[in-house]
Amino acid sequence: MPSPRTPRPLDHLVLPVEDLDTARSRHSALGFIVAADARHPFGTENACVFFADGTYLEPLAIASREECEEAARTGNVFVARDQAYRFRRSDNGFSAFVVGSNDAEADHARFVELGMSGGEMLAFSRPMTFPDGSQQTASFKLAFASDLRSPDFFGFSVERINVPAAERSALTAHPNGVEGISEIILSEPNPTDFQYLIGELCNNRETEANSFGMSVELNGATVTVFNKAGLETHLGIVDPSRERGLLGRAVVYRVSDLQALAALLLKNNVTARQVAGRLIVDPAPGQGAFYCFEEIR
């Protein structure tokens, strides 16, 4: 029977980086346009990469360690999780995926009821700078979901309040031809152990499982969790570790012309390999996940 739920849209991905200059340089070499630096009111900063499909990447850095530590001490889940990720993994990675929401408070109540709340909601405002140089104050509400068995990956929903529609065509016309995100890839030795967490975040309880892992559909994108066999077959990654818990691994992008992208990467001295019809660029400073590019059919 089809699910009565409506899958959420993918909003963005959180990608911890050591500093924004390195992230900007790396993503520019990959053929992305990177937006202006922006600061959060709790000590972190980002330089986002926006896409025509409404999704975006959030390379996230520490602007003020003192402000971040104070925010974490006073219950800011977003900062506390970022601090923990950097301590446990590194300053270069993929720590969370985010879905869009019209009611973050209802999401929080549902996460609490289901025993998967990641902590108290976060509400904040900050100025936004648009390509024409204008600024407006935007407000956000975040509801967090997590699993104690998975300390290095979490998710949340975001509700935007009084955020005006922005003309971002200048920021989405990427030289590499990327038009959006088609899939995000996580890993875990036994993926279905986390099907309820992923399903609730996606607002979709229909799970497609096979010998390589499982997938849950968002509105416009797919969340896939691979086991070790799936990582090796689909990404060419051999992982000898025995650790458990979800890990953010890869982002799959829709690109208009794979051959043109390959030429751009070669020109910019970016190494890529081909696996199952996709171009894959391995992580590097400023790029904490595998980036996979597939041509739009």
Kindly give the residue locations of the regions a language model identified.
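Glyoxalase I/VOC metalloenzyme domain signal
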Residues: M1-L10, L15-A35, F51-F124, T129-R297
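Short acidic/glycine-enriched loop/turn segments that link adjacent beta-strands
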Residues: P41-E45, V275-G277
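Short glycine-biased active-site loop of nucleotidyltransferases that positions the nucleotide triphosphate
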Residues: R39-H40, A47-F51
